[in-house]
């Protein structure tokens, strides 16, 4: 019985890891320059020997200030220990915040950190191949004042 339970657990973990890496082609859609009304996100796939599976994505989030564009945060999405994590580092921050992927589909990626003050969730939703919606909120059941949504369109630089 113990062998059967161990085997079932092994298969379950293996299938979860496969399911996570199997979603990589959908995450690759994130690559590129996404422009919104008040800023943009620029995502680049990075090959890094320090990253498990060699999969990571680097982002610089820019906010528009009048006619100037200033970076305000660096983000990385990495595949590590059989799951995806989103690591956010605001420019003025002393340390990074890690969000774990809790849902990943062809069109939606949800990263959560219930212990973080705000946001507790970061959601990337592909509305089409050329349109991306980013939402940050205070977790499930957030009120309207605790939800921020940005829409971006893919543009070539």
List PLM regions with ranges.
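Sec-dependent N-terminal signal peptides
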Residues: 4-13
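Sec/Tat signal peptide C-region and signal peptidase I cleavage site
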Residues: 15-19
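Edge beta-strand at a domain terminus
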Residues: 20, 101, 126, 131-157
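N-terminal helix-cap/turn-to-beta initiation motif at the start of protein domains
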Residues: 20-35
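Short beta-strand segments that buttress and anchor functional surface loops
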Residues: 34-36, 54-64, 86-90, 109-115, ...
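Short, solvent-exposed loop/hinge segments that bridge or flank secondary-structure elements
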Residues: 35-70, 76, 145
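Residue-level recognition of beta-strand termini and adjacent short loop/turns
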Residues: 47-48, 105, 128
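Contiguous, well-ordered beta-strand patches that form the walls/edges
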Residues: 68-116
């Amino acid at each position: 019985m113990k062998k059967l339970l161990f085997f079932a657990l092994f298969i379950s973990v293996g299938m979860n890891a496969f399911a996570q890496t199997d979603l990589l082609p959908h995450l690759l859609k994130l690559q590129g320059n996404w422009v919104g009304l008040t800023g943009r996100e620029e995502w680049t796939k990075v090959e890094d020997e320090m990253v498990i599976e060699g999969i990571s994505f680097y982002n610089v989030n820019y906010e528009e200030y009048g006619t100037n564009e200033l970076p305000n945060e660096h983000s990385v999405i990495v595949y590590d220990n059989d799951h995806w994590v989103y690591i956010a580092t605001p420019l003025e921050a002393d340390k990074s915040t890690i969000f774990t992927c809790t849902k990943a589909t062809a069109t939606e990626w949800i990263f959560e950190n219930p212990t973080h003050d705000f946001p507790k969730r970061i959601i990337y939703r592909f509305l089409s191949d050329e349109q991306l919606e980013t939402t940050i909120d205070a977790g499930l059941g957030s009120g309207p004042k605790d939800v921020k949504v940005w829409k971006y369109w893919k543009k070539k630089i």
